[in-house]
């Protein structure tokens, strides 16, 4: 099993969620986050003064999938979240040792 974390632009969330649903992903956790990478933020003008905005709003999606679903999940995120512009985000893939559904006690792939 793998955990996929995708940091994407907030306006892409609904499209990515729909794309993941189309490939059989039934659950995820979404968190509003702020950060920056190579784009380093931007400047904004407010009441005549310029301000540096270091951390940009992003959305972090966390999805646990079977090993067989990993490539399909990554492909769905890439195709949907990519704009071709700086700040599209990143995808991280981690190993998951064990999953337990609290309500039923089911474990691992049965609990996903």
UniProtKB/Swiss-Prot annotation:
Keywords assigned: Nucleotide-binding, Phosphoprotein, Transcription, Transcription regulation
Residue pairs linked by disulfide bridges in the UniProt entry: none
Listed GO MF terms: ATP binding; enzyme regulator activity
Modification type O-UMP-tyrosine: residues: 51
Keyword RNA-binding attributed: no
NCBIfam families: PRK10858.1
Complex formation: Homotrimer.
Role, per record: P-II indirectly controls the transcription of the glutamine synthetase gene (GlnA). P-II prevents NR-II-catalyzed conversion of NR-I to NR-I-phosphate, the transcriptional activator of GlnA. When P-II is uridylylated to P-II-UMP, these events are reversed. When the ratio of Gln to 2-ketoglutarate decreases, P-II is uridylylated to P-II-UMP, which causes the deadenylation of glutamine synthetase by GlnE, so activating the enzyme.
UniProt name for this protein: Nitrogen regulatory protein P-II
Organism of origin: Pasteurella multocida (strain Pm70)
